[in-house]
A protein has these predicted regions:
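Conserved glycine-rich Rossmann-like NAD(P)H-binding loop of the short-chain dehydrogenase/reductase
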Residues: 26-42
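Active-site-adjacent segment of SDR/Rossmann-fold oxidoreductases
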Residues: 148, 169-181
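Catalytic Tyr-X3-Lys loop
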Residues: 100-119, 163
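Active-site helix of classical SDR
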Residues: 122, 159
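Conserved glycine-rich cofactor-binding loop
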Residues: 12-13
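Conserved mid-core segment of classical short-chain dehydrogenase/reductases
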Residues: 82, 91-108, 127, 152
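Rossmann-fold cofactor-recognition segment
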Residues: 47-63
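Residue(s) in the substrate-gating loop at a strand-loop-helix junction
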Residues: 143
Length: 217
């Protein structure tokens, strides 16, 4: 019972892809969820003889993703694992600017991917691992924009602020349970990813803090 189970969302690019590569190990069982497969990750997993599977799922449809995750974890032999970790990393940006300049579908997807999906995936993860003897952990990848509002990305700020408060409430719930999961959120700071490129390349008219944001890199 030495294997560790890891479930990671948003593993196709950026920080999620980097985390996935760090988690590749013979005694880790990694399941990645993203809209697209990461072929480079698959090749590295094969070369390292590291168990890694990828689901191509749209987390803007989180009910289906959560149901699939719960059923899959429920099919595993809990006795074969020393512990289990869920990392909610996936996020979605709208176009940069006020919310009334964005499409309703963009705004909906930003909240579904950034907040509803972590909520439902965490619920599924906790249900499926409730009887596991080993430690359970949930890591929610947040952002400084969940703690400090910024013009031009209201939906992203709202999703990350909600994620932080969700984490606090979940941690209180799990603390009441015997062998409850440890739940934390982490704001990693400004990292060079496609998301940062999109923010820095936006129209300054809709992103008045662009210069300040760019200076943080």
């Amino acid at each position: 019972m030495t294997r560790q189970l890891f479930v990671l969302t948003g593993a196709s690019r950026g920080m999620g892809a980097a985390m996935a590569e760090q988690l590749l190990a013979a005694d880790h069982h990694l399941r990645c969820i993203a809209r697209h497969r990461n072929d480079a990750l698959a090749a590295k997993a094969q070369a390292a003889a590291a168990p890694c599977e990828q689901w191509a799922l749209d987390l803007a449809q989180p009910v289906e993703a959560a149901a699939r995750l719960q059923n899959w974890i429920g099919s595993l032999d809990a006795a074969a694992y020393a512990g289990a970790t869920l990392i909610n990393n996936a996020a979605a940006l709208t176009r940069i600017g006020p919310i009334d300049d964005c499409l309703d579908a963009e705004l909906s997807a930003a909240l579904r991917v950034g907040l509803e999906a972590p909520l439902l995936l965490t619920a599924a993860f906790l249900r499926a691992t409730r009887g596991w003897a080993g430690p359970k952990r949930v890591l929610n990848i947040s952002s400084g924009l969940g703690r400090r509002a910024m013009a031009g990305q209201a939906s992203y700020c709202a999703a990350k602020a909600g994620l932080d408060h969700l984490t606090r409430a979940l941690a209180l719930d799990e603390a009441q349970r015997p062998f409850g999961a440890k739940v934390v959120s982490l704001a990693p700071g400004v990292i060079d990813t496609d998301m940062q490129v999109a923010l820095c390349a936006g129209d300054p008219a809709g992103f008045p803090e662009q210069a300040h944001f760019f200076s943080l890199k």
